[in-house]
């Protein structure tokens, strides 16, 4: 499938180009500027808009319940963020077209006013909205939000879809051709440690989906996960070790596209295993260099979703928050 240009803009010394398959290119004069040059505004904003989730984890009794490893603690009693307030904040921030917003939760498509928000930000303001959903919410069998998701993708309200999977539904998702055909930017979300390395490898390497995209996420040892037994955590830690020991071979053998969040890069020690030229040209930088995190349920912000240090959003703009995050990114916990 041929790439189509979604956005191109200048952010301080950096030229940013984004294509419809999710490819992002950042270019600057590295002889004149640092490896993480200071920008005028954030290029990608991770925004939690809800803590509501009906329950998307299939337990041993065959029932759906809340995910036991959810660091957000999302549940059927979780609260929603105010999307009108978020949209107003985006407008006041005077951001150029093409800024990426990674919208998550909880279940983001259950948030009141979500369609109006997407129409405003994706269509009227031409921002790039990426949404993360649990596959059980959008599966062809009983996924309550499947048609809504497909409709939003076809209408361009969502440009990228991240799909969280587990061992019991990964194969079903890999065979979901209807969903795969809707967009060239559908990404499988895999949590290392939680998901078995060998199960993931077997399913991915033997599926018919050509060049699947995978985002490997670092396991977060807090939130609901922190309440699990030490025995369960020990089992997951062994899985993390297996991921760490085999990740380089996985990258060499996999015929798709693999990316990592910064936590996974750290926990699996990925950067030290890669050639310098690969790191120099493909590593997108640390959290806070051109990104930021908002919890719009609690109306707080931080450097990243795992940040313990949070500050109230108040009446700040995205530009003001980014400046604060960037200037304090090295000491921000």
Give the predicted meaning of each segment:
Residues 44, 52, 71-83, 96-111, ...:
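Core AdoMet radical
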Residues 56-62, 139-144, 224-238:
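Short, flexible/disordered intra-domain loops and linkers
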Residues 88, 113-123, 148-151, 202-203, ...:
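Alpha-helical scaffolding segments of alpha/beta enzyme cores, especially the outer helices
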């Amino acid at each position: 499938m041929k790439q189509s240009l979604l956005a191109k803009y200048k952010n301080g010394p950096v030229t940013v180009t984004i294509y419809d398959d999710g490819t992002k290119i950042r270019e600057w004069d590295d002889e004149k500027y640092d490896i993480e040059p200071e920008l005028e505004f954030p290029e990608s904003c991770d925004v939690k808009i809800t803590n509501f989730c009906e329950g998307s984890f299939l337990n041993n009794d065959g029932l759906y319940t809340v995910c036991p490893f959810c660091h957000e603690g999302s549940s059927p009693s979780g609260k929603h963020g105010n999307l009108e307030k978020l949209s107003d904040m985006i407008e006041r921030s005077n951001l150029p077209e093409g800024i990426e917003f990674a919208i998550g939760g909880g279940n983001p498509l259950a948030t009141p006013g979500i369609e109006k928000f997407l129409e405003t930000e994706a269509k009227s303001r031409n921002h790039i909205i990426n949404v993360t959903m649990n596959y059980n919410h959008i599966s062809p069998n009983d996924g309550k939000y499947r048609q809504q998701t497909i409709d939003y993708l076809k209408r361009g309200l969502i440009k990228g879809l991240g799909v969280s999977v587990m061992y019991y539904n990964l194969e079903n998702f890999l065979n979901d051709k209807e969903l795969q055909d809707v967009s060239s930017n559908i990404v499988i979300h895999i949590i290392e440690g939680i998901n078995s390395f060998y199960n993931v490898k077997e399913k991915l390497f033997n599926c018919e989906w050509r060049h699947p995209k995978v985002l490997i996420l670092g396991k977060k040892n807090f939130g609901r996960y922190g309440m699990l037994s030490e025995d369960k955590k020990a089992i997951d830690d062994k899985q993390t070790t297996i991921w760490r020991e085999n990740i380089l071979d996985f990258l060499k053998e996999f015929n798709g596209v693999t990316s990592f969040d910064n936590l996974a890069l750290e926990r699996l020690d990925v950067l030290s295993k890669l050639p310098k030229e690969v790191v120099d040209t493909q590593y997108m930088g640390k959290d806070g260099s051109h990104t930021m995190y908002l919890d719009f349920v609690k109306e707080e912000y931080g450097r990243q979703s795992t940040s313990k240090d949070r500050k109230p959003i108040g009446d700040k703009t995205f530009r003001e928050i980014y400046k604060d995050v960037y200037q304090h990114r090295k000491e921000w916990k």
